[in-house]
A protein has these predicted regions:
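N-terminal accessory segment detector
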Residues: 1-181, 189-191, 195-203, 207, ...
């Protein structure tokens, strides 16, 4: 399969779908490590180790429960299951599950800090973590797809379809001029859940500015990011946040 001709996850063949599952496991491990590193940086080793214990115990239970239920294995020293014996549909289902576990892991870390040290410290750690995870994920995707060093807006469009979030949320792209496009998050798992509960949007703009700016620049340093709207900003019903990417 020529990956340069692949535009979205569903276009991958069997082998590369399996490779992407493994790559997403790698991403969640790095994200976990970056959370610990930032908590250590912000609060010191002692508090970080205490929070790590709480977060790791909860995170381990959440993730292993989902994985063991989906794959039908008992928890015992880890059980290797050959991914290539799974159908492509099973691999995609597992990939989506890993993505949800990644988001749950993010929430576990956020709440572990919030419940012990307050919302402000949790948001500081969250935004700092994204400043490191976004460039990492961008580089991981560039490596997976064999993108060039400066793949331009078309490279960014493709890369956005391979983020972990692409397995969780519903997103779309609106082309503008030849040197820009708008990326919309039409359904956000976190914000949609809050909406169902009658809660206000979670104010994620500070994190989003870091997340999308750093991701785009890591894909191609010539790309600039503009926030069209992101909570707590008002937004239309069709999207929760929207971002304009321009090639300079």
């Amino acid at each position: 399969l020529e990956l340069k001709n692949v535009e979205k996850i569903e276009d991958l063949d069997h082998e590369h779908t399996a490779r992407l599952v493994l790559d997403m496991f790698h991403r969640i491990i790095i994200h976990y490590a970056l959370w610990f590193n930032e908590v250590k940086h912000q609060m010191g080793m002692e508090k970080a180790l205490d929070i790590l214990k709480k977060a790791s115990e909860r995170s381990y239970g959440i993730q292993m429960k989902r994985l063991s239920g989906a794959l039908g294995f008992d928890m015992k020293d880890g059980i290797p299951l050959p991914l290539l014996k799974q159908s492509k549909e099973s691999l995609k289902k597992l990939m989506d599950l890993v993505a949800v576990n990644w988001l749950a892991n993010d929430g576990v870390w956020f709440q572990a800090v919030e419940f012990t040290h307050g919302m402000n410290d949790a948001k500081r750690c969250n935004d700092s973590c994204w400043a490191q995870f976004s460039p990492f994920e961008a580089q991981a995707i560039k490596n997976f797809l064999n993108l060039s060093e400066e793949p331009g807006l078309e490279g960014l469009k493709k890369a956005l379809n391979f983020r972990v979030y692409a397995c969780i949320n519903t997103q779309s792209i609106v082309d503008e001029e030849t040197d820009s496009f708008v990326f919309q998050m039409n359904e956000c798992r976190v914000q949609s859940a809050r909406k169902r509960k009658g809660l206000d949007d979670y104010p994620c703009k500070s994190g989003g500015l870091v997340e999308y700016t750093y991701f785009a620049e890591a894909i191609d340093p010539r790309i600039r990011t503009q926030c069209i709207g992101c909570p707590p900003d008002d937004h239309p019903e069709e999207w929760f946040c929207a971002w304009r990417f321009t090639l300079e």
